[in-house]
Amino acid sequence: MRHLLDFQGWTRPEVESLLDTARVMREVLERPVKKVPALQGFTVATVFFEPSTRTRISFELAARRMSADVVSFAAQTSSLQKGESYKDTLLTLEAMGVDAYVIRADSAGVPHQATRWVKGAVINGGDGRRAHPTQALLDAYTLLEALGTLEGKKVAIVGDILHSRVARSNAELLPLLGAQVFCAGPPSLLPQSLPGAHLTPRLEEALEEADAVMVLRLQKERMEAGLVHLEDYIARYQVTEKRLALAKPQAPLLHPGPMNRDVELEGTLADSARSLVNRQVQNGVAVRMAVLYHLLVGKGR
């Protein structure tokens, strides 16, 4: 594994190896001193051409927990505002000796292009609606913690599937671990196809006997005006206590964030014991530590 762009071509043993490393990193994070020298001497750049809170901070913490130097690039205060291209921005960082790049962009394919521009490892931190592999990895890790295994498990993903890179990456990854993925949303927010997932406009079909439920927000910033009416969406697709009763008892709830309470998910459920949202955030640091380790000094080298 030289880069992490998506899960095309990945095998189950490769995924399991990375998640095993994440478990070791989780143990590190539970120590009184949450730091190891594994990446001492390496430099990691978080290059975010699109705004982010969770992913950027999570990666920066992950790198620092392993003693790497971190460079945080913010598009709003960079030479991009003066017309500099993505390529020239990355080549500038390359000249400064960066070893790994975590790249987020509003356009699909930018991390793939970056692998041709720089010598360092490239990690896709989310590109357009195409992929968000580390989010899917932390989702899988969290589900395995809760369920023990994903073999034969039904995972329902509900919400704005059309614009969701999280749904696409989970549809690639979770079946590798044996899960069945059902994606539900309004017809206008479903793609024509999604490899690895069964698509349905019927919320009940996705939730029925689900072992776990992942809820996605409406990505209004990527929508055309009038694509969905909020009141109608809430009435038909909000995950409520009553609708969740269709899933298996105590089926865990996940959400990649940011969450719009009482829109895609009933607020009381977000705070319930079934909600693993905060656990996802905690696990995200360990998973991203594992990714950086594999790419820079571990089995990826």
From Swiss-Prot:
GO biological process: 'de novo' pyrimidine nucleobase biosynthetic process; 'de novo' UMP biosynthetic process; amino acid metabolic process
Keyword Secreted included in the entry's annotation: no
One Gene Ontology MF term: aspartate carbamoyltransferase activity
A GO-annotated cellular component: cytosol
Pfam name, any one: OTCace_N
Top-level taxonomy: Bacteria, Thermotogati, Deinococcota, Deinococci, Thermales
Residues annotated to bind carbamoyl phosphate: 54-55, 104, 132, 135, 257-258
Keyword Phosphoprotein in record: no
Gene for this chain: pyrB
PANTHER family: ASPARTATE CARBAMOYLTRANSFERASE, ORNITHINE CARBAMOYLTRANSFERASE, MITOCHONDRIAL
EC numbers for this chain: 2.1.3.2
Binding site for L-aspartate: 82, 165, 217
Assigned protein family: Belongs to the aspartate/ornithine carbamoyltransferase superfamily. ATCase family.
InterPro entries: Asp/Orn_carbamoyltranf_P-bd, Asp/Orn_carbamoylTrfase, Asp/Orn_carbamoylTrfase_sf, Asp_carbamoyltransf, Asp_carbamoyltransf_Asp/Orn-bd
Family matches, as PROSITE patterns: CARBAMOYLTRANSFERASE (PS00097)
Subunit-structure text: Heterododecamer (2C3:3R2) of six catalytic PyrB chains organized as two trimers (C3), and six regulatory PyrI chains organized as three dimers (R2).
Name used for this protein in its record: Aspartate carbamoyltransferase catalytic subunit
SUPFAM superfamilies: Aspartate/ornithine carbamoyltransferase (SSF53671)
Entry keyword set: Pyrimidine biosynthesis, Transferase
Involved pathway(s): Pyrimidine metabolism; UMP biosynthesis via de novo pathway; (S)-dihydroorotate from bicarbonate: step 2/3
HAMAP family the UniProt entry points to: Asp_carb_tr
Catalytic activity reported: carbamoyl phosphate + L-aspartate = N-carbamoyl-L-aspartate + phosphate + H(+)
Role played: Catalyzes the condensation of carbamoyl phosphate and aspartate to form carbamoyl aspartate and inorganic phosphate, the committed step in the de novo pyrimidine nucleotide biosynthesis pathway.
